[in-house]
Structure formats: structure tokens, C-alpha cells
């Protein structure tokens, strides 16, 4: 066959009948980057349209996204240098700003799906993903 037949793409009805994959908002996971503080928004230069947000603005962003049908969010903490240690102790502190924010998100928006990562690299002063002695 030298030419691909276009008959299967001629109309929307035919395309929807034979498509193998349909992506909806149920399939999307929105990445969010959490910083400590209040009413701050910092652009992530390498990811246009993505920002580091404080807890108050992150809640508003999640509410907005849920209104659009996006319910799944992957929340990454951005830890200040002063809170990073060789043993990544901030990562397992029960009252950290990250865990407080996750609890607040679930309390205010129980229908949201929050995805987290147990990686230690945001908390370790040497940047390793695991604590090493």
C-alpha cells in the first residue's frame, strides 16, 4: 500500500467509532509545586504555565482545576535550604508545611486525588533521594 486510506478519518463519527484511545480529564494528573509562606507564586521557568505556590494559592488552584474536571494532583514540596539536613529530618516531621497542606487539601476538597512521593531528595542537604550514613 503506497497511500494510507483516509476513509477512516473522514468524519468525526467514523473517528470516534474506530479510535482506540480517548483521553479525558479523568486521565490527567496536574503537577503542583508547594512552597512555604502565604500568597506567593513563583514561575517554574522550565515549565511554562506552572508555578510554585504557597498553600493558600494551591488550594485555589486545585479548586479551579476541579471545576474543569481535573481531580488528580501530584504535589511536590520545595523545601528551603535552611530546612535541609543530611538526614532529611524535615521529610518525616509530622507537622511539616507539606504534610499540613496535604491534610488541609483533603479536608477542604475530599474528592481530590492527591499523589505524593516519598523521595527524600527535597529534604536532604546533599540532594540524595535516600538517607545515607
Task: Please tell me what each predicted stretch does.
Residues 9, 27, 53-57, 93-96, ...:
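Conserved active-site and cofactor/substrate-binding residues in soluble primary-metabolism enzymes
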Amino acid at each position: 500500500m503506497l497511500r494510507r486510506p483516509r476513509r477512516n478519518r473522514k468524519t468525526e463519527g467514523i473517528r470516534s467509532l474506530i479510535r482506540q484511545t480517548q483521553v479525558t480529564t479523568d486521565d490527567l494528573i496536574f503537577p503542583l509545586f508547594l512552597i512555604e509562606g502565604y500568597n506567593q507564586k513563583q514561575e517554574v521557568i522550565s515549565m511554562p504555565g506552572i508555578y510554585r505556590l504557597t498553600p493558600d494559592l494551591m488550594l485555589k488552584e486545585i479548586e479551579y482545576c476541579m471545576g474543569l474536571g481535573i481531580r488528580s494532583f501530584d504535589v511536590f514540596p520545595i523545601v528551603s535550604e535552611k530546612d535541609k539536613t543530611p538526614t532529611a529530618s524535615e521529610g518525616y516531621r509530622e507537622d511539616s508545611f507539606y504534610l499540613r497542606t496535604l491534610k488541609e487539601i483533603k479536608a477542604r476538597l475530599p474528592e481530590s486525588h492527591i499523589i505524593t512521593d516519598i523521595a527524600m531528595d527535597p529534604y536532604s542537604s546533599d540532594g540524595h533521594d535516600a538517607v545515607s550514613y
